[in-house]
Amino acid sequence: MDTFLFTSESVNEGHPDKLCDQVSDAILDACLKQDPESKVACESCTKTNMVMVFGEITTKAQVNYEKIVRDTCRGIGFTSPDVGLDADHCKVLVNIEQQSPDIAQGVHGHLTKKPEEIGAGDQGHMFGYATDETPELMPLTHVLATKLGAKLTEVRKNSTCPWLRPDGKTQVTVEYRNEGGAMVPIRVHTVLISTQHDETVTNDQIANDLKKHVIKPVVPAQYLDDNTIFHLNPSGRFVIGGPHGDAGLTGRKIIIDTYGGWGAHGGGAFSGKDPTKVDRSGAYIVRQAAKSVVASGLARRCLVQVSYAIGVAEPLSVFVDTYKTGKIADKDILALIKENFDFRPGMIAINLDLKRGGNLRYQKTAAYGHFGRDDPDFTWETVKILKPKA
């Protein structure tokens, strides 16, 4: 039997890049909660003792940017210099301007265009992917790496492993076989976890606790065997972490946010962007389309691409590839997708309820992946059953 190895990684919410994603999306949430028509392009960066937010925001909302930054960092667990950042004493820099009037007139006509007329906020191409290898219709490598990262945070915050600190990374290698284009996981080949820890814990305790409290509850026993390799803090020491260990930037973890290297990626990041930014809304609608194809039994794997021009409402192209797993021809699946999904940015925002912010709606997306989540706020995960014409 021919098999191959494929690997996906994840980072948890204390990674400096992910901290920045969460800050940017917390600001988006605050703007949309008060003003659903907010136009937000918010970037963040961080290094030792400093967080900066910068970008273009046009909103009627009254937003205390500094408070949002500090609250977000505190919620993650950055509460002292020892762990990499002190939310209450770090420097917070803010450099926010209004959206360019050139972009505003071209995209939404300074808020005068009807929803169906609103143009894309920029050019670009976005991909959605789905696969039947997991209940989430997501790649197993990505699902396991992401859940390991989430479990690391859970056992840190509930004090199961009090030696844990906020920063951490995971990586999972799975052995697969190709079944006529569909991906069938056979076993987990390697699990890698590198987690920040305090000064006192031993490497033996780190390894034992990670196996017992993180790996065992997350990785199904059917995928583990005597030959599974574990690399647990292989560098030997990870005390200095968070923004003290590495600088962080919004939009640096786009593969972790999506499909773990499977499918394809157009290059655009998600966090800090309102729904007129098709980097985000376009990627959400094509995930819904690809997931609906697989959930409807039309294919075992599906990739959907959409592309846009700035200021133009209709997409330039829509593409489908089922990797030869389709029950009907790809061109017929494409026709079904075009009939059932409206790819115009203004209509995506309405149909997926993307103008609704607050209550961590977008901040939740900024750690542990935007897709495959069982949460009603992730409206793009809702399946539309697609039926071929008789």
UniProtKB/Swiss-Prot annotation:
Function (record text): Catalyzes the formation of S-adenosylmethionine from methionine and ATP. The reaction comprises two steps that are both catalyzed by the same enzyme: formation of S-adenosylmethionine (AdoMet) and triphosphate, and subsequent hydrolysis of the triphosphate.
EC number(s) given by UniProt: 2.5.1.6
Residues reported to bind K(+): 43
Pathway participation: Amino-acid biosynthesis; S-adenosyl-L-methionine biosynthesis; S-adenosyl-L-methionine from L-methionine: step 1/1
Keyword tags: ATP-binding, Cobalt, Cytoplasm, Magnesium, Metal-binding, Nucleotide-binding, One-carbon metabolism, Potassium, Transferase
Name used for this protein in its record: S-adenosylmethionine synthase 1
Record-linked SUPFAM superfamilies: S-adenosylmethionine synthetase
Organism name: Actinidia chinensis var. chinensis (Chinese soft-hair kiwi)
Keyword Cytoplasm found: yes
Family per similarity comment: Belongs to the AdoMet synthase family.
Localization in the cell: Cytoplasm
InterPro entries on file: ADOMET_SYNTHASE_CS, S-AdoMet_synt_C, S-AdoMet_synt_central, S-AdoMet_synt_N, S-AdoMet_synthetase, S-AdoMet_synthetase_sfam
Cofactor binding notes: Binds 2 divalent ions per subunit. The metal ions interact primarily with the substrate. Can utilize magnesium, manganese or cobalt (in vitro).
Complex and partners: Homotetramer.
